[in-house]
Amino acid sequence: MLLAIQYPSWLHPEIIPGLPFLRWYGLMYLVAFGIAYFLFSYQVKHGEFERYSGCQKAMTQDDISDLFIWGILGLILGARIFGTLVYNPETYLKAPWLIFWPFARDGAGNLTFTGFQGMSYHGGFIGGFLGVILWTKKSKFKFAAVADLMAVSIPLGYTFGRLGNFANGELYGRITTSKIGMIFPQTPISDRFYLAESWVRDFAEQAGLLVQDGASMINLPRHPSQLYEAFFEGIILWLILWLLRKKKPFDGFLVCVYTLGYGFFRFFIEYFRQPDANKGYPISFGTGAANIYVYESWKNISTGQILCSLMILASLAAMLILYLQEKKLKEKKGNIDG
């Protein structure tokens, strides 16, 4: 008996099979941006921007729309450039025009529409961050105050971005015999396993898979790590920030909590997620470092975990600096009032 969850048979990358330009991935991005826009507008409409940030300049709906244009543009550019040049530089440094080329050739050599697959969260974070900085400089708003509102607005939308990855059958986890494992039908041949290897047959048996007569390869169950990320980095992180939004001690606190929380959750979920084959483990002190498809040791650190560690350290440093600045301002104000 199969001891894994069946991937939904009705779910395909295309919303309507045969219409490649209508894809769940793109739709989920639109939903994510829409949710972030709604939550940001909600906070501004209810006076939370002025009340909890100390910012005296009112923000209009036109300001919000302009901000999101800058932020989304920075996010998309950063996510795509970072995702291609950091994770697959060999291909894109030779042909940089492919970075924004939404087509690829399938196994038969036919040109097919794929959209912008290979969007890096960390690149999107940096790009969106820079976009918001540029907008606040242009519009004369306090960056830390605006960033706090963005931090509260983003995670719930991010949830749908990961659901888009799930619909694409990409960014899946490592193989597992757990009952919450899932067989992704879109798994390419390069990520399937040869039945000639005894450990593969044993693994398939533990997972309750039936091996077809004459089959040479098998698609093993994997952790649906996209759903883990959607839940922890999306829903849970959003709930934490939503509850803290009226209790922040200083401007910039919430964006630091967001960066810290995302880095923390993602670091541990990376142990379930399969690293990029061309990157493997940049840091490996544990056993089985060559086997990226199965968890061997917590000492094997992926590129994603290195980037998350930098996020955690940067958020802690920024939080300390902002706290000391706020403390200094209060002391200065107290001396003046005294």
Swiss-Prot record:
Pfam families: LGT. GO terms for cellular component: plasma membrane. The chain crosses the membrane at residues 24-44, 67-87, 115-135, 141-161, 224-244, 252-272, 304-324. Its EC number is 2.5.1.145. A 1,2-diacyl-sn-glycero-3-phospho-(1'-sn-glycerol) binds at R162. It comes from the Bacteria. InterPro entries: Lgt. Keywords: Cell inner membrane, Cell membrane, Membrane, Transferase, Transmembrane, Transmembrane helix. It is an enzyme of class 2 (transferase). Its main location: membrane. It is found in: Cell inner membrane. GO terms for molecular function: phosphatidylglycerol-prolipoprotein diacylglyceryl transferase activity. The keyword Cell inner membrane applies. Pathway: Protein modification; lipoprotein biosynthesis (diacylglyceryl transfer). PROSITE patterns: LGT. GO terms for biological process: lipoprotein biosynthetic process. It is a multi-pass membrane protein. The keyword Transmembrane helix applies. Belongs to the Lgt family. Catalyzes the transfer of the diacylglyceryl group from phosphatidylglycerol to the sulfhydryl group of the N-terminal cysteine of a prolipoprotein, the first step in the formation of mature lipoproteins. This is Phosphatidylglycerol--prolipoprotein diacylglyceryl transferase. It comes from Treponema denticola (strain ATCC 35405 / DSM 14222 / CIP 103919 / JCM 8153 / KCTC 15104).
